[in-house]
Amino acid sequence: MVLTVTDLACARGPAQVLSGVSFSVSAGEALILRGPNGAGKTTLLRTLAGLTPPLAGTISHAEDAIAYAAHADGLKAQLTVAENLTFWATIFGTLDIAPAIAAFALAPLADRPAGELSAGQKRRLSLARLLVTGRPIWALDEPTVSLDTENTARFAAAVEAHLRAGGAAIIATHIDLGLPNARSLDITPFIAKGLPASDPFADDPFLGAAL
């Protein structure tokens, strides 16, 4: 297993959102998180990524194994597409941004400042950064927001390539990504007692993307 979660309890601020969450993910496997809006999918991903401490339970994985992509794109607007990828590649100790450029068809945009991109183009750049992290576990929160059908397919192809290389992915999404071997986990049974799934405080978007 590349990641094992045991009896995890998660909180957003002072409110407990989830309890008793247990699952594991193996190399080459994708896990799709399901549940209604506000159920705690974002909170769970933030906790897995180490951005929010768990209230209880354990998360077991190799050190520095997780790359987290949140709702917000978190790009450096003044840098070009290529410069954004180079910046992150340098941080993560990788050298070649060409595979990331190719995977998300960013070559025509390579010299354009990120601040001038459309919403869909920004999302493609944000997701392309996953390929320069070198990290085996991708934790992705609604990754296809702002993507059209063609680029959703590109994203799915990038995930499949990552899985074939021995990586893993945990994805919160409401759409079918076309990943035939992906497992699903409905987190609704893990919603903390007394907290309605519709509570907006339970699961608001993270605005400081880890990537």
From Swiss-Prot:
<dbReference type="Pfam" id="PF00005">
    <property type="entry name" value="ABC_tran"/>
</dbReference>
<dbReference type="GO" id="GO:0005524">
    <property type="term" value="F:ATP binding"/>
</dbReference>
<keyword id="KW-0997">Cell inner membrane</keyword>
<feature type="domain" description="ABC transporter">
    <location>
        <begin position="3"/>
        <end position="211"/>
    </location>
</feature>
<dbReference type="GO" id="GO:0015439">
    <property type="term" value="F:ABC-type heme transporter activity"/>
</dbReference>
<dbReference type="GO" id="GO:0005886">
    <property type="term" value="C:plasma membrane"/>
</dbReference>
<keyword id="KW-0547">Nucleotide-binding</keyword>
<keyword id="KW-0472">Membrane</keyword>
<keyword id="KW-0201">Cytochrome c-type biogenesis</keyword>
<comment type="subunit">
    <text>The complex is composed of two ATP-binding proteins (CcmA) and two transmembrane proteins (CcmB).</text>
</comment>
<keyword id="KW-1003">Cell membrane</keyword>
<keyword id="KW-0067">ATP-binding</keyword>
<protein>
    <recommendedName>
        <fullName>Cytochrome c biogenesis ATP-binding export protein CcmA</fullName>
        <ecNumber>7.6.2.5</ecNumber>
    </recommendedName>
</protein>
<dbReference type="InterPro" id="IPR027417">
    <property type="entry name" value="P-loop_NTPase"/>
</dbReference>
<dbReference type="InterPro" id="IPR017871">
    <property type="entry name" value="ABC_transporter-like_CS"/>
</dbReference>
<dbReference type="InterPro" id="IPR005895">
    <property type="entry name" value="ABC_transptr_haem_export_CcmA"/>
</dbReference>
<dbReference type="GO" id="GO:0017004">
    <property type="term" value="P:cytochrome complex assembly"/>
</dbReference>
<dbReference type="InterPro" id="IPR003593">
    <property type="entry name" value="AAA+_ATPase"/>
</dbReference>
<feature type="binding site">
    <location>
        <begin position="35"/>
        <end position="42"/>
    </location>
    <ligand>
        <name>ATP</name>
    </ligand>
</feature>
<keyword id="KW-0813">Transport</keyword>
<dbReference type="InterPro" id="IPR003439">
    <property type="entry name" value="ABC_transporter-like_ATP-bd"/>
</dbReference>
<keyword id="KW-1278">Translocase</keyword>
<dbReference type="GO" id="GO:0016887">
    <property type="term" value="F:ATP hydrolysis activity"/>
</dbReference>
<comment type="similarity">
    <text>Belongs to the ABC transporter superfamily. CcmA exporter (TC 3.A.1.107) family.</text>
</comment>
<comment type="function">
    <text>Part of the ABC transporter complex CcmAB involved in the biogenesis of c-type cytochromes; once thought to export heme, this seems not to be the case, but its exact role is uncertain. Responsible for energy coupling to the transport system.</text>
</comment>
